[in-house]
Structures are given as structure tokens and as C-alpha cells.
Amino acid sequence: MLDNQNIFYKKKILIYGLGKSGLSAFKFLKKDNEITTHDDKIKDDNKKIIKKKFDFIIISPGIDINKCNLSKYLKDNNKKIYTDLDIFYNSYKRNNKITITGTNGKSTTAKILYDVLRDQKVDVRLVGNIGNPVLLEKKITNKTVFVIEASSYQLEYSKLFKSNISIILNISPDHLERHKTISRYVSAKFKLIKNQSKEDLAILNTKNFYIRREIKLKNFLPKIIKIEKNTNNNILKKINNPYFNTDGNRDNLKFVLEVAKIMNLKKNFLFKTLKKFKGLKYRQEIIFQSKNLTIINDSKATTFSSSMSLLKSLTNVYWIVGGQAKKGDILLLSKKSCKNFKAYIFGNNKNFFINKLKKIMKYESFLDLNSLIKRLFLEIKLEKKTKHRTILFSPSAASFDSFKNFEQRGKYFNYLIKKYINV
């Protein structure tokens, strides 16, 4: 239900960036405000925009104020910059919000929480970086609960947004091409906690170095709930879902169980939901399984850290890796921990991955994914080994060197696999 005290009312507003977020802000605000739009991809008269006086500038997550066309103008007017999350919070202050951020596992954790609440008959909406943009939801009442996935790009310029329950799953170096330093990246993530009040809760993975250091260095108002212990084996037995066998998915599960405890959810419905959860497409997705071979499509893995939980839990692995390497990415994998691994490296940046992996495991390199898959299945055919093998497509890199996004990359991998096996 809309809040009456809306500061974004009868104002002059510039919406910068016309992607999903910007367009949703335009639709939400146009009725009661004087709106001007700008997108760097569309030819506009920048001088006219600069001369106008705006009360607010709503910036889309994809806009980097250090690189965009109106960079100086935005920096000079930084105090006026807000986000769609700010508009959303200002409009729906009364509604309960659970917001998830972190380097890895945001979408999966948000989807599990959404499924859990939906199955408990809660009027719940899945929004943000997953699902609808936050401003497109309709038929909202005071009882509506929002599960929000928030990226560092969304949080970076937010000034008002806060959540009743905030979750930071983990932090490892990522998006440094935008944030420049790990310190700035951490600060963007902790915007989620910074705006909270004493009545709010922050659930944090304090085993994580960057999270642990941040809460030692700074004082935050919300009650901090530390996630440190492993998930109880009895609970895992009750859930009985192989999806939660990897370290990463068990870590995500711990946060879900903590929220369920806080919200006093019914355990029988909770375990029933968790038992049937199958995961999201292209995220540790098992696309084929037989007696001797498992094929996993983990195209969403865009850093080494996002591949680690699977790599640590597997043996006898054909690891397909490659793409646009990310600035500051660190591989924390030893030769000892790689039991019978072989890397199949593809793409224009293959030398980066060769240098990272050559002392840890055997490898072959290929110009593209097509020639790699062809060679891999020939090798499997010639092998006489009876051990169970896993083909792991977990690129540990961004997809933009060859693909539009990780979804297109994941879809292409499935297409190639279907040439050799019935997926």
C-alpha cells in the first residue's frame, strides 16, 4: 500500500538510463511529476539537460558516473542522485522487506526464500535483480512481503532504502572494473546495513573475511545475527535434497533457515519446500546424469570464487573454464584439493587461465567452446576408465567476450551438449 509521505511527488525529476529499472521508474513517477529522461545510447541535447534544474536524479544501476556522458554533471549533483530502490522504500515503508546481497548466491537464496514464504501462504513478491523491477509490482497491501535481490550497482547510489531483514551472504573481489577497489565494493554492499535502524536485523556471514573486518571497523545500528556454524546434519536429513550437498548451497540454506526461525514459519511446510527445490537455470544445474557421467551447467559462475563450492565438492572433473577475466579475481585452489582434475580452457583470454591453472592441474586450451566440446567427447569416448566423471561448465569469468550474458552462454553450452548426448 502506498505511503502518504512521498517525497517523490510533484517534483522535477531526471531519469538517467532507460533499461528495465529506468523505464519502471518512469512509469511509476510520470503521473505526479515532471519527468525528463536521458540515456547515453540515445542522442540527446546534453546542454539542455545540464541547464535544467531538477529536484531529483534517478540513476539506473548500469550507469557508472565515472564513465557516462554526463559524468561531471552527476558528480556535481551527487546529493540529488537516488535510485529505484529509494523510490520503492519511500512508497512502501510499511511493508516488510527481506533484502539479499553478496557476491555469490543472491538469486538462489532469494528464490528459496520466496518459495518458502509462498508455500506458507504469505503474499510475497520476488523483485529487484531477480523477478520484476521493484516498481512494477501491483495489488500491494500492508501484508505484502518483498524478497529483494540487490546488487552492488543497485545499492551504490541508494540513500533512503532500508530493509527490515538484510542479508549479506559473502563478499569476494568482483566488479572492480566499476568499483575500482575492494574497499569501495564492500562499502556498496554495506549500504544495505548502513541505513538500517535498531529495530531491524542484519544476518551476516561472519566467517567471511571482508564482512568480519567491516563490522569490526564500523558501528552499525541493526541487531547483527552472525552465521558461523554449519547446518545441522539432522536438518539436512529431513530436507533430503542433493541440491544442498555443495558448500555454497548449504551456506545459502543457513540464511533461509535463520529467516524462517525469525518469522516463526511452520517447519513441516518449510522442509517440504526445501525438499523439492531444484535450483535456478544455469546455476549449478545438473543437465545430465548417468551411472558414469554427470554434466553440470554453471554458466552463472563469473568469478573463481563462484566456482569454488562445486570444485571443492567434486572429484574426477573435466572443468570447462574461460571468458572475460575479472579484475582482482583470485583463485584459492591448490593442487592437493584437485583430485583428478583437467581444465579445458576456451576463449580469447585463455592465456590468463593457463597461467592460473598450469601448476595445479592438466589442461588443454581451445579457441572456442564448440571445438572444446568436440574434443572433450572424443576424449571421453577413447577413455576406458570406469570411474564416475563430471563435466563441469563453470567458466569463472564474465561472458561478454563472446556472449550477450551468462544465460546466452548457458543456453549455447546446452545446445552443444545435445549434439553428443540426449539432455
Tell where the protein language model's regions lie, with residue ranges.
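Nucleotide phosphate-binding/pyrophosphate-handling subdomain across enzymes
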Residues: 3-12, 23-28, 123, 242-340
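Short internal beta-strands
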Residues: 36-39, 202-206, 320-321, 340-348
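Short, charged/polar "capping" segments at the starts of alpha-helices
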Residues: 43-46, 64-69, 208-214, 232-233, ...
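C-terminal helical cap/extension that packs against the catalytic core
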Residues: 330-388
